[in-house]
Amino acid sequence: MATLADIGLAAAINILSALIFLLLFAILRIQPFNDRVYFPKWYLKGVRSSPVNSGAFVSKIMNLDFRSYVRFLNWMPDALKMPEPELIDHAGLDSAVYLRIYLIGLKIFGPIALLSWSILVPVNWTSDGLQLAKLRNVTSSNIDKLSISNVERGSDRFWAHLVMAYAFTFWTCYVLMKEYEKIAAMRLSFLQSEKRRADQFTVLVRNVPPDSDESISENVQHFFLVNHPDHYLTHQVVYNANELAKLVEDKKKMQNWLDYYQLKYTRNKEQRPRVKMGFLGLWGKKVDAMDHYTAEIEKLSEQIMEERKRIKKDDKSVMQAAFVSFKTRWGAAVCAQTQQTKNPTEWLTEWAPEAREMYWPNLAMPYVSLTVRRFVMHIAFFFLTFFFIIPIAFVQSLASIEGIEKSAPFLSPIVKNKLMKSLIQGFLPGIVLKLFLIFLPTILMIMSKFEGFISISSLERRAAFRYYIFNLVNVFLGSVITGSAFEQLDSFLKQSANDIPRTVGVAIPIKATFFITYIMVDGWAGVAGEIFRLKPLVIFHLKNFFFVKTEKDREEAMDPGQIDFYATEPRIQLYFLLGLVYAPVTPVLLPFIIFFFGFAYLVFRHQIINVYNQKYESAGAFWPDVHGRIISALIISQILLLGLMSTKGKVQSTPFLLVLAILTFGFHRFCKGRYESAFVINPLQEAMIKDTLERAREPNLNLKGFLQNAYVHPVFKDEEDSDEEGLIEDSDDEDCVVVQTKRQRSRRTTVASSNASRGSSQSTPFNQLDLGKGKPET
């Protein structure tokens, strides 16, 4: 059981760690040779040039301006100066909405902390429930006198906690509603003012039914010319190019090694570099490194060419899917948001993700296999969550000196040392839990990829959902349950079964001390480590020394990174959960959470302005997930408070808390119906307005040229295939086209407008269909 002294030691360690990280960052960021590490965003935008290109040698390495060291903390006010509209233009709406999550934390928990400390803390402190609990062998510490555990069983003081639960809920719901309304308006405004992008006109069609007489490309073209004759423009079929992508990736790796050895040779021309041919280059025959990698690259180039030819000729490489582009956003919206045929399992349409956020390997997965894959991952996630309770129990065993002494008496001489005791209880559990969770986001992302999601945003949102569930079940509930068992081990073993719920009711708020230590490790030192950027700093200088030859190489060596939504958002949600659960129970935890939200907002705002470069823009599409999880945390806090109050002899409060949970769920349904459509549906009115304005501004826009290669697989956009682009044939000069099928069972033809004829198929740079004068290619 962590005491006030233990928490003080943990706070000292984490504050010192955070200050060291911040000091190192403040000094390193102003050194010229680190400029690309701490300001890569501005280099990518082309508004910042390298300071190491001019001046004396020493000034290229070290900042000799003494005044800059005096102003080394200027990054803090600078991070707050940029107004939100400018931030959206600079970094995108996703980044701005992400920052608002931290602001919501401050808006919610600031007033809640004020109320709880002014009302609940005096109520708890002036009670003497823990004195009575000690008679039942319940372990506690002085800090627990600030919690609900100190209120006597059956006391009327619990009505104060009930009233505060209502106040906290109403305030949280008010803040959430205002934010939902604000962000929905920001999203619609952003989409309306956004520049023209291919995904605004494009729909992904999946589960295209096979036809024995027509290819997939011909089938897609025929279907949309018939059913969307006035709006269909062009399409690109989806190819299984995963093997080709692997070859291209291998070639890039070989090229990197060749560049490295060429640079090494230019620095020492007296001896050509050699490499061993054995496993990992540890043993085997030595050969000339440059000759070896040159030969490997030539070999891979031939394999890539052969694989491309195979894909051209093999119909099995064509998946039952296509990207279909339309002449207007309105036409794309109608197609994406409607059912295409009476069979709901065929011709499935959805908005195409932004081209740069496509996860191309998953497009090659057969659509029918996705259900099986997702079921398998549900089972795998269940077992991952279930078995992770073992390390959680280990962490909680560290958090309890009493539990260690009872289960391992031989360690008593060590843990009885005051400094060691404070270190074990106040710092070690939080850092061990943090280490156990390091690889979890990566594992969950791999599971999401296996499920077959086709966009990075959908992958991240699924992984984030699972991470949130994992935190809820293991990090929160698992820590409370296992920790209570360890700390109250003697009570659990000696008392009757009827008394165990009462002991748990007292022990749950006592676990606040463990979560305080975890918040300091993860939310204080962890956030400070984020701005320090140790890993990108080391990697950049290694690349700069071994691989960089030109300014382009130096730019590629930069690693600006991005906001990993799947890893960061669930962590934030854990703080919302802890804050809402413990606000009416143990208010002492709230200042630690408020400091986290304020500090993280400052750090991540700086990173978004100067460092991060997002790979895609979803216009804040993830906000409904954020809102829903905060509501879930609110309902969980009410249910846990209900259980706690019932164990404390206040069963009559149960109806009031049940009503509160029902009201909270009703509020969620209201927000879902009122605001969520802005995040999942593109209003036809907005699409028509944008189309009309675009036609007025650019009456001669060649939209087909803009769209025809937008969704070609990246491996087909290699410079070596530039000659393939010449294979694209246009039929814009036709005034009328007869859409004629190749089916032997049907001789019907469909006359389409001349506008539709301009939408002739543009499958890929190497698979085109020329309609000519209405005669299909044979």
From Swiss-Prot:
- Tell me where the transmembrane regions lie: 7-27, 101-121, 158-178, 375-395, 427-447, 467-487, 512-532, 584-604, 626-646, 651-671
Keyword vocabulary terms for this entry: Calcium, Ion channel, Ion transport, Membrane, Transmembrane, Transmembrane helix, Transport
Which locations, inside or outside the cell, does it occupy?
Answer: Membrane
GO CC terms, sorted: membrane
Q: Which GO terms describe its molecular function?
A: calcium-activated cation channel activity
Q: Report which superkingdom the organism of origin falls in.
A: Eukaryota
Q: Where is this region: Disordered?
A: 738-778
Low complexity bias spans: 753-763
| UniProt entry tagged with the keyword Glycoprotein | no
Q: How does it sit in the membrane?
A: Multi-pass membrane protein
Q: Any idea what job this protein has?
A: Acts as an osmosensitive calcium-permeable cation channel.
The entry assigns this protein to a family as follows: Belongs to the CSC1 (TC 1.A.17) family.
Would you tell me the protein name for this molecule? Answer: Hyperosmolality-gated Ca2+ permeable channel 1.4
Q: Lineage of the native species?
A: Eukaryota, Viridiplantae, Streptophyta, Embryophyta, Tracheophyta
